[in-house]
Amino acid sequence: MSLDRKYAIASRIVREIRRDRRSIAMIIGAPVIVMSLIGFSFQTQKSVLNEAAPALIATMVMFFVFVLTAVSFLRERSQGTLERLLSTAVSRGDLLVGYLTGFLIFALIQSLIILMYTLFVINVDYAGKLWDIIFILLIVTITSVNMGIFVSTFARNEFQII
């Protein structure tokens, strides 16, 4: 497995997502809007929000990361990029690690946006260490990226993913 090939694939994914305004809106805008609505809905019931916050954060991270990864990977397949890469000398392992790394960069950014917005803008109280929360969120994020790639291999269009 070549580190250069993995890096090239991951950097191409990063460039593609950075150029796509819809993906950037999905990474930043959608989670902030949804978490704002949730925070506003529980504005008078702070204790309920504090109890539900861990599940909400995990659910939002899982949903948004899954959708971002699955839709982006499906777009790669539908545009023929994946098939062109498979016809080159790139091994399937390099391809998989490159795609995982590329998507994981934006998934981690999105997860941190959701977490920080929930903790510091909505002001959810949390017990424990922030690093413990980030570690659990990292596991959820990696799982969601893998699930997004897995499900997108069976989907024919974006509506089947959502």
PLM features per residue range, with description:
Residues S2-L82, R92-L112, M116-L137, T141, ...:
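Transmembrane helix-boundary elements of multi-pass transport/secretion proteins
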